Amino acid sequence: KSLIVVPNHITEQWAAEWLQLYPAANILVATERDFEKRNRRRLCARIATGDYDATIIGHSQLMKIPLSRERQQAILQRQIDEVLLAISDAKRQKAENFTIKQMERTRKSLEARLEKLNDQSTKDDTVTFEELGIDRLFIDESHSFKNLFLMTKMRNVGGIAQTEAQKSSDLFAKCQYLDELTDSHGVIFATGTPISNSMVELYTVQRYLQYQTLQEMGLIHFDDWASDYGETVTAIELSPEGSGYRPKTRFAKFFNLPELMATFKMVADVQTADMLKLPVPKANFHTEVIHPSELQKKAVAGLAERAERVRARVVDPSTDNMLRITNDGRKLALDMRLLSSLAPDDENSKVSVCARNVYRIWAESTAQRST
């Protein structure tokens, strides 16, 4: 029984194209209304008892079908045990106090989640994922689930995010359940960008799809995986606020790539643009050099001051942070009006220059009805 999980906005498109390919197929397509509290049990009952060739749901809807309480407890307890082992190992190796404190925070967070789950006073009559009878899980655009928490002793290394998205943790738990059920043959990922920002994302994909293999190889912990396949490199980069340059360490140099790719290709069918030979029109690129206005220069200087305050930790992260500063930098680079509605309409901003070019090309090609 297959469950197809796709981005929310294309569930109906997937259904239409599925029926175009397989007109006689019996498929079930879930809508947002189906996952409202009063309708969810009815939908889950249809999935569990129906003989469908496929059930198609959206990314956000997958979390609304939880694993059983007992399985969630077992998974959380296993994660807590792994953290305790890592803390013990870090203390034995006399790791930095910051690293150990970070691991302790992780342990407390997991224990709080386990305690909340153990609260039997919470009535739970939700149909669980196991009760649906799903034995094949297909995830389209799987890179949307890349924020899976990892533990590492590395500090201040770019490309190694230790933030966790709840939807990623939920999918990881379901992947482990299906691994047990199908001997690691029940999960399929599809994406055009398995690695978008950092090679750490390859490790994340392997945790989803090759958890048992990593365990057998002794590479289940990121630091072990990283020591086998890569190293950190420090280089001079433009600062996020654009006010100057600074040294930045990244997990960016790799070795033993043949061995890494051989392991990865045990579960991956890689198709590049050259292999697919898709009909792609030739692009003619034109570079437009846009000079900043005085107002933009002042705004960039303000970003630099904000960044210094963030680095010095004199501002609350909920008030200002590097992500917000970078986002403001992108906005002001396009048009100052994105930052302030009171800013003047600059005819030499990126947006204005782009609009003039689009109109000019449209006017010149009107006779051919070009787009």
Where are these regions (language model features)?
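Short, solvent-exposed beta-strand-terminating loops
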Residues: 143-149
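Glycine-rich, phosphate-binding/catalytic loops in enzymes
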Residues: 20-22, 71-75, 153-161, 204-208
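Motif I (Walker A/P-loop) of helicase-class P-loop NTPases
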Residues: 1, 171, 203
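Short, intrinsically disordered, charge-balanced linker/junction segments flanking boundaries
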Residues: 1, 366-371
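Conserved Walker A/P-loop ATP-binding site and its immediately adjacent core
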Residues: 2-27, 34, 60-64, 194-201
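Inter-lobe coupling linker of SF2 helicases/translocases
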Residues: 40-86, 92, 98, 105-136, ...
